[in-house]
A protein has these predicted regions:
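Alpha-helical transmembrane segments of multi-pass small-molecule/ion transporters
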Residues: 1-307
């Protein structure tokens, strides 16, 4: 438990450094400009390198299907629960779309990866990447966009083919890594060292970027009726669903604990992009990210103790 608290304290300090950048704007670089650069570097270079490094070595098999099923079903059931709640309280469309995205899609990589890696070790990189690339990301780029379009402004241009969303560096890296893995091709010694060094840059850049995305200016009293159920579903109901599913899927030990905790992470940052593009309530979503991230500093240690 002490290790968990120490890890979260370290993550919090690094996030606060990112949040401090928003206030100080060194060299007149705004937080949004800096975050765009950092997240682009991670997405187009460091993340694919880490995906290649991890999945090339990973034990891909039945457990990969377990992770995929656990992540996918947990997200789908959370979407259903949030939709029912939005219907019950008669949320308007822009708020409904934002709340569904915030409650159902966890920050499995940008926060989950560094937290789980620090607590359980490097082996969790494989777990996080498989939940992200084989469960959450496909749902974000398909069902997530469909929901955003449905609840957002009308008149949006026809979306690209679903396959076009997967024409991205992390997915290509995953494809190459899985092919190399299944063909049992060894990683050259010189390349292994390079991949590991580059992979080490991902976690601190992710945490700092997350801090850049947080803004207390987005906190609005009028949004509290939407934020309370969002946080309840994201930080408590979804992990309960994941815990129940993990038992059905025969996941045990540390893999079960790490997988459930990954799905207990706060709202993903990327959802703000979908809210902006499809005219959902972006302010509400930004507040959900800030509040659930802050509350996760309490909920994650509790889940760690329970699991």
């Amino acid at each position: 438990m002490r290790g968990m608290n120490t890890t979260l304290m370290q993550m919090t300090v690094l996030m606060l450094c990112g949040a401090g950048w928003r206030v100080l704007t060194p060299n007149r670089l705004s937080a949004d400009q800096t975050r765009l650069v950092l997240t682009s570097v991670v997405y187009y270079f460091f993340m694919p390198v880490m995906v290649l490094d991890v999945l090339w070595r990973a034990d891909i098999g039945w457990q990969s299907l377990q992770y995929s099923a656990l992540g996918s079903i947990s997200i789908l059931l959370s979407i259903l629960a949030t939709w029912m709640l939005a219907k019950l309280f008669r949320f308007k469309n822009p708020q409904t779309g934002a709340v569904i995205l915030a409650a159902a899609f966890p920050n499995v990589t940008y926060l989950g990866l560094p937290v789980l890696e620090q607590i359980f070790g490097d082996w969790t990189r494989s777990l996080v990447i498989q939940i992200d690339l084989f469960a959450e990301a496909p749902l974000v780029y398909t069902l997530g966009i469909m929901l955003a379009r449905h609840y957002g402004a009308t008149g949006e241009p026809k979306p690209k083919s679903v396959l076009a969303f997967f024409n991205a560096p992390p997915f290509w890296a995953a494809f190459v890594a899985v092919v190399l893995n299944l063909n049992q091709l060894p990683i050259p010694f010189w390349l292994a060292g390079l991949l590991q060094k580059c992979s080490g840059a991902v976690a601190p850049l992710m945490i700092f970027s997350l801090g850049l995305a947080l803004s207390w200016r987005d906190i609005r009293v009028r949004n509290l009726p939407f934020i309370a159920p969002t946080a309840l579903i994201k930080l408590w109901l979804m992990p309960l669903i994941a815990l129940w599913l993990a038992s059905l899927l025969n996941l045990t030990g540390q893999p079960r604990t790490a997988a459930v905790m990954d799905l207990a992470m706060p709202s993903m940052v990327m959802g703000i992009v979908l809210c902006d593009r499809y005219k959902l309530d972006s302010g509400l979503y930004a507040m959900a990210v800030t509040v659930t991230t802050a509350l996760s500093l309490v909920s994650l240690p509790l889940w760690y103790r329970v699991l």
